[in-house]
Amino acid sequence: MITGIQITKANNEALLNSFWLLDDEKAELRCVCAKSGYAEDQIVPTSELGEIEYREVPLEVQPTVRVEGGQHLNVNVLSRDTLEDAVKNPEKYPQLTIRVSGYAVRFNSLTPEQQRDVITRTFTESL
């Protein structure tokens, strides 16, 4: 089960008043917002934050059904390792082309933020 939390006490002062989504089953936290040191949507093991105290924040999840027409599917046949390696070694993948929003685009032409977003949205395992 996912629980929303606000950190009220921590050894790391940057964590004070930050908001997280806590997944007890996987012992992971997803950052919603923090002063510094953690990016939005960054997932970390709970042990990384050290000794903390927190208060639960109610989460409101309302299922909504919105029909706006057809569906869209981008199919990229490659592995997460390939994309991660392309981020680290772009010179090895000058012709790597992926589908983004219906368009073919060279992976290396994307900004680092866009590359990370593609990897995150394409290969999800939790949260």
Swiss-Prot record:
What is this protein's record name?
A: Autonomous glycyl radical cofactor
Does the keyword section mention Endoplasmic reticulum?
no
Q: Which domain of life is it from?
A: Bacteria
Keywords attached to this Swiss-Prot or TrEMBL record, sorted alphabetically, are: Organic radical
Q: Which HAMAP family match?
A: GrcA (MF_00806)
- A cellular component annotation (GO) from this entry: cytosol
Q: What residues does the Glycine radical domain cover?
A: 5-127
Picking any one GO molecular function of the record gives: formate C-acetyltransferase activity
